[in-house]
Amino acid sequence: MSVTAAKGFRAAGIAAGIKENGNPDLALVVNDGPSRAAAGVFTSNRVKAAPVLWSEQVLKGGEVTAVVLNSGGANACTGPKGFQDTHATAEKAAEVLGHSAGEVAVASTGLIGVLLPMDKLLPGIGQAAAELSEHGGEKAAIAIKTTDTVHKTAVAQGEAGWTVGGMAKGAGMLAPGLATMLVVLTTDADVDAATLDKALREATRVTFDRADSDGCMSTNDTVLLLASAASGVAPGYQEFAEAVRTVCADLARQLIGDAEGASKDIRIEVVNAATEDEAVDVGRTIARSNLLKCAIHGEDPNWGRVLSAIGTTSAAFEPDRLNVAINGVWVCRGGSVGDDRDLVDMRFREVVITADLAAGDASAVIWTNDLTADYVHENSAYSS
């Protein structure tokens, strides 16, 4: 599993001392080639962390040899010194690996507004390089965790023997675009940078961009896709894009399943919308209703809160034609009372809300979670 499932990649995860608790906090992923094609998508937040600004520039070259990822500090809103530290991180990785700093992407996650302890991070890169292994993917995934309770990995296999693997972190600040998350995807398929970019953007649009835990957009979101071509197989575009989408969907689902304080995973299906964009807008608006999220936490099938959220959007619909189902029970029909709400079984982890707009044939799925006291507690004490 993870980033070393594909041939041509090595990874490591270590405790460099960035986190005060001594947990793993530094990961290194290296592409040994023969190709080093790469693509990336980043946060749409206008306040971008230093590693995002750096990696955006690196990706313009279409090649990435290595990725350095740290948890325990976001290196966001840290001024010129923060960018200098990111540059120094890439330079150190390039030095120990024998490559160019211009091919080293950097990603960070953690508290905003705090400079990284470079006296620990830079030596840690050398230590991580010494521990690089074709079996190091799981350790790398563990090292990028922040408030995550579990590490997240996924893999998909192509029929001709090529692979797409990946790792992700994220538990809070999960909201489009991208959803806080760091993701590294790897493939040993022989795919050029332009094709990687197309497949990655198509995949993130319908996966990570549709995970919306708490409506808060990170400064550090980074999703990278690296190709080694080590399998020697050049798959057709559709097969390759489907594999990338499968891995992204798996990881996005894991992100929601590990959202901070969550006890329910909520799948919001918007159907019969006039356009896909309107379906996404409605789904996202429902996902951001704190009233609804609290109701789901209390296992209350309060369909009125769904209709109330829909009504705030600009989507095309007639109020007296709206239908809402919760876990398969149509509790609202024609904009009014539907089937007996007591028939709704909400005892299980997953809750499915279906909103039928009766305005067309477009649809979309958005994932979110409930709002709990644990979420409030965790985020009220995050920096203390």
Where are these regions (language model features)?
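A structural signal for small-residue-enriched, beta-sheet-centric alpha/beta enzyme cores
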Residues: 1-85, 94-384
